[in-house]
Structure formats: structure tokens, C-alpha cells
Amino acid sequence: AAGKSVGLRINPQRSTQDGHEIYDPCAPGSRLGTTRAQWNAAVAANPALPNLLDGLHFHTLCEQDSDALATTLDAVAQKFGDLLPRMQWLNFGGGHHITRPGYDIAMLERCITRAQQDWGVTVYLEPGEACALNAGYLLTRVLDVVQNGDTTIAILDTSAACHMPDVIEMPYRPPLLGAGEPGEKACTVRLAGPTCLAGDIIGDYSFDAVPAVGDLLVFGDMAIYTTCKNNTFNGMPLPAIYARRPDGTTREITTFGYSNFKHRVGK
């Protein structure tokens, strides 16, 4: 359409993922991005196709440093370097952990400069979780504590499946204020949700003493991939959202009730 800039997502077929396969667009058989073989076949069928494009886009990173970007850019140059001089822009996608301590900013700058100098393109980076890395808390209370053999299990009023699905999907173990790794402190406890999903498990943590019913637990790094992915499976309520001021006081942003659940599934 007139006034629109058209781009194509490409698949450089160079995987840099380690432990995040669910977020790896370069995995074999991926549905995300056009491979060079697919591009060649499409152009053979429609030679005018390259003239329709203003830019190329790849999004292959997930919580990674710029060395993974450099590796990806090498693959892009190898697979698609001949196409880029005719493009106006190149989008590096997201997944850059720019705000993480130790992130190699200089390497990122070299990658951007390389693309600008080699192909004359404008370079874009998409905002990602680095914008809110290590921000946000999820507060939960202990509903029950049970013992199954040697395993102590605390049932919480939050759910991995409903409120932090990446814990199961990636998987990963979210940080918990004041807790240690399994076996680090006196009591190791498995924290789990109350849903019917047997695998609704947040992880194993150690404490100085087993948490009691009613105790408040605070998970960190919860601002990303939580509110946008949460759900009401088993009728689990959605967490209320509060803003914490610098002086420690809080302000209610929004709360959720039955009407929110009802409107999501019908009138």
C-alpha cells in the first residue's frame, strides 16, 4: 500500500539458542522466517518479488548477549548478503539483553556499524524484555503445606500455569526473595500452584524454616511475560496490579474479578 514500508522476515538458519528451544526460530522445521531456499523458489516463481521489499527482518535471539547477534549476522551476510544492498533497512529483532550486567555493548555497536557500512541500511532493534529486566514482583501466600515422602510441598495461591507460564514453557526457575537453591538452606520446599495440572510446579527452593500457611512469598523479575500471558485456567483469579512508589507505598492500578472472567468467555 502507498506510504507503507514492506519487509520480510528471514531465517538465517543459524541457531544460537541453548535451553530456550521453544523460542528458537532457527530450529529445524521452523515456521518462522523465510529461508534462502524458500526465497529462491519464490523469486523463480515471481521475479518482481524483490522490488516489493524495503527491508529484511530477523528475530532469532532470546535473552542473549551480542556475541550471539554477531554469529547471527555472519549467517545473514552469508545467506542474504547479496540482497541487502538494495534494501533500505535491516531489523535485528529482539532478544537482546542490553540492560543485563556484563552485556557487551561494544560488540552490539560493531554489529550495527557493520550492517550500516556493508549494506547502507538503517538498523532497527526491537524493544524486548531488557526494558524491564529484573523489574516487578509477584506476591503470593501459602495456602497449605503437605508432605509426600521426602518432598515437602507448599501450595500457593498463585500458579505457574496461570500466572507465570514461561516457568513451564521455557522452563525456568524465577527468583524468590530470601530463598536459596535446593539444599542451600535448612529446609527445601517445592512450591506449587493449586490447579488440577500435576505439573503446576514453580520450583524447589530452600528456606531457614518451612513456610507456614498464610506466609507471604515474593517472586522477582515478574514484570515481563506475566501479565500478557496469564490466564484463568481452573477459575484461577488474575493477580491485581499495583505500582510501588519510591517511598515504599503502593498505588492500585487495576484489579480483576469474576466479571473479567465472564466477559472473556461470553456475555
Predicted regions and their residues:
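Active-site-proximal beta-alpha core segment in soluble small-molecule metabolic enzymes
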Residues: 1-89, 101, 111-114
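Gly/Ser/Thr-rich helix-start
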Residues: 34, 56, 94-96, 129, ...
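A short helix->loop->beta-strand "cap" motif at the edges of active sites that frequently abuts
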Residues: 4, 120-121
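Charged (often Lys/Glu-rich) extended helix/loop segments that serve as interaction or gating elements
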Residues: 111, 122-267
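Short, small-residue-rich loop/turn micro-motifs
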Residues: 10-12, 94, 160
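Conserved active-site and cofactor/substrate-binding residues in soluble primary-metabolism enzymes
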Residues: 34-37, 67, 71, 75, ...
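Glycine-rich beta-strand-to-loop/alpha-helix junction loops that act as flexible
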Residues: 60-61, 90-99, 127-130
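A structural signal for short, well-ordered beta-strand segments and their strand-loop junctions
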Residues: 7, 91, 123-125
